UniProtKB/Swiss-Prot annotation:
Gene3D superfamilies: VC0467-like (3.40.1740.10). HAMAP family: UPF0301. This is UPF0301 protein Dtpsy_2896. Transmembrane segments: none annotated. It comes from Acidovorax ebreus (strain TPSY) (Diaphorobacter sp. (strain TPSY)). One of its GO terms (cellular component) is cytosol. Belongs to the UPF0301 (AlgH) family. Pfam families: DUF179. PANTHER family: UNCHARACTERIZED PROTEIN YQGE, UPF0301 PROTEIN YQGE.
Length: 199
């Protein structure tokens, strides 16, 4: 690779699993990439709901969900890493002029594209009091790739990539998210071959 070629950065992109992906965690999954650098990548699966509702999750952590609009929303399986830990993907809680240090929550990652991922319980406490981010997606667990691992999977045609559209995350019914993400590329699922990229 020429020295002046910038490394690939897929932060704020969707990874869309190709039909050949056999790992049950990732089959027909759409992963929102929160972070991608030469050190690796971190993302959340946005289309695999668990049987637990947000209300049920709040009961498990001794909180009462104070947001009627979120009561029936499912908690998602974010990936196979740290599956007992909660991750909250939400709209940024501060204006563009404010610094990264001004998040109202103790542990928040700022993502280009107007989103944040918070792992501290204070975001749940804000939701319990009827406040907090307007739109949220809560997962148990996350997806991670080590240095060069995602690039290797991309070279093997395990994933399609496309810039993220937050409406797919927050406004699209769960069962339609895979097809909607494909649609961002002008594709439909019937167009994908399980053998793509393999001679």
């Amino acid at each position: 690779m020429p020295a002046d070629t910038a490394p690939m950065n897929l932060t704020h992109h969707f990874l869309i699993a190709m039909p050949g992906v056999e790992d049950a965690s990732f089959s027909r999954s759409v992963v929102y990439l929160c972070e991608h650098s030469e050190r690796g990548a971190l993302g959340l699966i946005i289309n695999k709901p668990t049987p637990i509702s947000l209300e049920g999750l709040f009961e498990k952590v001794d909180l009462s969900l104070g947001r009627e609009d979120l009561t029936l929303q499912p908690v998602f399986q974010g990936g196979p890493v740290q599956t007992e830990r909660g991750f909250v993907l939400h709209e940024a809680m501060r204006g563009p002029q404010e610094s990264e240090d001004e998040s109202p929550y103790a542990s928040t990652m700022t993502i280009p594209g107007g989103l944040e991922m918070t792992t501290s319980k204070d975001v749940l406490e804000a939701l319990a009091h009827g406040a907090g981010p307007r739109r949220v997606l809560v997962t148990l667990g996350y997806s991670a790739w080590g240095e060069g691992q995602l690039e290797s999977e991309l070279a093997e045609n395990s994933w399609l990539t496309v810039g993220a559209d937050v409406s797919v995350i927050f406004e699209t019914p769960v069962q339609e998210r895979y097809d909607r993400a494909l649609g961002l590329l002008g594709l439909q699922s019937w167009m994908l071959s399980p053998e793509a990229g393999h001679a």
